Amino acid sequence: EVFAEQPHDRAHLFGGAIGSVARYLSEEEGPALLPEPDRAACARLLGEAVVRVYPLVAGSGVPLPQVKLRNMRSQWGNCHYQQGYITLNTALARCPEPLRDYVALHELVHFLHHDHGSGFYAAMDARMPDWRARRQKLKGYARAIVE
């Protein structure tokens, strides 16, 4: 199964409990966030991001991982390559699609390169040439992460 159900602070991508992820930001505070999605929409938006970018790594032997959702305080996602899953921050659902895709690909590339060395960045460059611009835009959404 691609998406796995987890304890209360995580959610099955197509159902389950996902907590509130972010507060409203005014234009003075940063870029406008998308409206807070309901639980099902959050799961759908983040699941679709993984599905969209997975073909970029599939040819390199990366298995389609389990995807866990979690309300995280300091990061947009992480990869547990030895256990075969990635975790995406539920707050990412309030960011534009290109930024969701960037984070999903970033985590998938960690199945190829476990650290942020030159090989990792070369793999990102080959698969998403504008990833640096997306990363820079994502920094403007940092307040979406729940304190």
Roles of regions detected by a PLM:
Residues 1-102, 111-147:
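Active-site-proximal or metal-binding-adjacent scaffold patches in catalytic folds
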